[in-house]
């Protein structure tokens, strides 16, 4: 339909210019006849190379009119075609496209106005997308805030109720053992089993509470925050904890993620590994920040680890969010090693140019 319309427009221009040429031809012949008082028979009899002169003039007029109409119509058709193609591009949602200059007449003015319209629509779309992103970020932040508050409430309730009751059970069983020294071995053994189970439950509860209500950096550097965290774990857990943490000048976001990864790793160790020793190492080597958490616990078979394991997935996701990778290596009966590698770019290196000799 559009091509037919443009073709019709071009042919109309050809017909118009050809008609004007014929009219001028008739006017010219009439002027020559009346002004020079020429006999029409003379004009008809005049020839050039055997071709009547009047026929030559007629052919020249028609040719000039046709050529002029074709060139003008084709140029007009091309400009309108460009304008229509551009409108279709805008209709398809590509508002970044701009119509090329089409001249200073009405068509060019229409193209300029369409470009201005596309620019305004593009800005409005960008503004809507920005608002949508901000809304999504706000919702995510609200969700995190609600989850954090709920975890704090749950941790507080567990500490005030279950943890205190477990402590009371442990104390009562210890007191009972003092008063039943003369009881049979079977009874004493069962009481000691209850005491041991209460102690294990207390350790599990401590690890769970630290996981639910974790310590945060709160303006401290990563080394200081990790040192306080590890010292707190050492006081609350019957396990040997060693660490070698290098000072690192990295961004706050990277520090927060690494701190959370260590928290998650320690929580997993205390809750599942049955380890007697944990080592935490943090240093820089080959333009990479490397974090290792190593325990001598029971380990697990790598091919049997659950893909849905929340702790391992959480650490891998946090490492990925800061452009790093988290690798887990475990040998059944020998322990587990979690290693996180994060690239350090030149602007982040600062004082970290020297490699850490503790990272192998």
Curated annotation (Swiss-Prot):
The lineage of its organism: Bacteria, Bacillati, Bacillota, Bacilli, Bacillales. Residues 153-346 form the Histidine kinase domain. The gene is liaS. Its EC number is 2.7.13.3. Residues 74-126 form the HAMP domain. It comes from Bacillus subtilis (strain 168). It is an enzyme of class 2 (transferase). It catalyses: ATP + protein L-histidine = ADP + protein N-phospho-L-histidine. Induction: Induced, via LiaR, by antibiotics (vancomycin, bacitracin, nisin and ramoplanin), cationic antimicrobial peptides (human LL-37 and porcine PG-1), Triton X-100 and severe secretion stress. Residues 37-47 are extracellular. The modification Phosphohistidine is found at residue 159. It is a multi-pass membrane protein. Member of the two-component regulatory system LiaS/LiaR probably involved in response to a subset of cell wall-active antibiotics that interfere with the lipid II cycle in the cytoplasmic membrane (bacitracin, nisin, ramoplanin and vancomycin). Also seems to be involved in response to cationic antimicrobial peptides and secretion stress. Activates probably LiaR by phosphorylation. GO terms for cellular component: plasma membrane. Keywords: ATP-binding, Cell membrane, Kinase, Membrane, Nucleotide-binding, Phosphoprotein, Transferase, Transmembrane, Transmembrane helix, Two-component regulatory system. Pfam families: HAMP, HATPase_c, HisKA_3. One of its GO terms (molecular function) is ATP binding. It is found in: Cell membrane. The chain crosses the membrane at residues 16-36, 48-68. This is Sensor histidine kinase LiaS. Its main location: membrane. Residues 1-15, 69-360 are cytoplasmic.
């Amino acid at each position: 339909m559009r091509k037919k319309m443009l073709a019709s427009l071009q042919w109309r221009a050809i017909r118009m210019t050809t008609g004007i040429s014929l009219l001028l031809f008739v006017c010219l012949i009439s002027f020559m006849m009346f002004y020079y008082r020429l006999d029409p028979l003379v004009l008809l009899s005049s020839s050039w190379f055997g071709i009547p002169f009047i026929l030559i003039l007629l052919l020249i007029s028609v040719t000039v009119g046709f050529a002029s109409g074709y060139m003008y119509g084709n140029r007009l058709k091309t400009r309108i075609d460009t304008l229509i193609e551009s409108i279709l591009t805008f209709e398809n949602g590509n508002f970044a496209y701009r119509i090329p200059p089409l001249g200073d007449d009405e068509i060019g003015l229409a193209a300029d106005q369409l470009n201005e319209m596309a620019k305004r629509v593009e800005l409005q779309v960008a503004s809507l997308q920005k608002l949508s992103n901000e809304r999504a970020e706000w919702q995510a932040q609200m969700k995190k805030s609600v989850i954090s508050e709920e975890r704090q409430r749950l941790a507080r309730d567990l500490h005030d109720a279950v943890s205190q009751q477990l402590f009371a059970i442990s104390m009562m069983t210890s007191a009972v053992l003092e008063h039943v020294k003369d009881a049979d071995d079977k009874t004493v053994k069962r009481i000691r089993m209850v005491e041991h189970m209460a102690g294990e439950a207390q350790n599990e509860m401590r690890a769970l509470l630290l996981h639910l209500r974790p310590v945060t950096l709160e303006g401290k550097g990563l080394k200081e925050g990790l040192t306080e965290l590890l010292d707190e774990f050492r006081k609350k857990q019957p396990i040997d904890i060693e660490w070698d943490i290098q000072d690192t000048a990295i961004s706050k976001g990277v520090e927060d993620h690494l701190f959370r990864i260590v928290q998650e790793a320690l929580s997993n160790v205390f809750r599942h590994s049955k380890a007697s020793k944990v080592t935490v190492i943090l240093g820089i080597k080959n333009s990479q920040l490397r974090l290792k958490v190593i325990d001598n616990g029971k380990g697990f078979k790598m091919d049997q680890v659950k893909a849905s394991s929340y702790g391992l997935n959480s650490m891998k996701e946090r490492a990925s969010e800061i452009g790093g990778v988290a690798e887990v290596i475990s040998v059944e009966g020998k322990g587990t090693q979690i290693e996180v590698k994060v690239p350090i770019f030149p602007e982040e290196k600062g004082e970290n140019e020297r490699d850490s000799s503790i990272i192998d």
